[in-house]
Amino acid sequence: MALGARVLSIRDVELARGERVLLSQVNLDAAPGDVIALLGPSGSGKTTMLRAIAGLDAFQRGSIEVGEARMEGGAAASRDELRRLTRSVGFVFQFHCLFEHLSALQNICLAQVHVARRPQHEAEQSGRELLRELGVEARADAWPRALSGGEAQRVAIARALAMNPRVLLMDEPMASLDQSRRAELGKLLQRLAGAGRTLLVTTHDESFANQFANRILTIRDGHVVEASSGS
């Protein structure tokens, strides 16, 4: 992979909590358009790896570069670095984590207005376009509790895309979906990758990974123990 093609670079990352090592000597390069599936049992380090990339979990050694943001192990990220990271990375949590007191559209607009300082009308226009792209524009004014699992997930994806991140992190996005919805999600991931985004997706579903990811990493006890190609 050419240096200029990388949008994500992880070098020798180690992360521990107390005596427990959660990530050990993790290395990864990712390019625009990559769909990378992270396979592994519960507790293997998949979610921790995503959280470290997003700046949510501090790591002790190594470095992570995402777009123009760079984090060093053992050092607190500066405010400017965190701002660059926020604009480079979108995160879709396993449980969609939508704010229950905000409508679907308001959830999507929140970061655009308060972090990116976009005017409200521009944020709403952008939010509606994202909802339309994801097939849930009719649910823009719905409260999260009124959304189905698949609808809530698509709203969460729209929220993660609202800041136009270069890297999209998705933690177990298939967990609450039936087989047909999983296939729809896989096609959505491929469309997003086709638009030049880099996606990292944690999953227990090896068949999904083989069908929709172009790269597969297997993580066990914090180590990347296998790398293979998917679709």
Explain the meaning of each model-derived region.
Residues 143-147, 151:
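Conserved ABC ATPase signature
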Residues 168-171:
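Catalytic Walker B motif of ABC-type/P-loop ATPase nucleotide-binding domains
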Residues 70-72, 120-139:
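Conserved ABC ATPase "signature" region
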Residues 162-166:
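A short, proline-enriched helix->beta-strand linker immediately N-terminal to the Walker B motif
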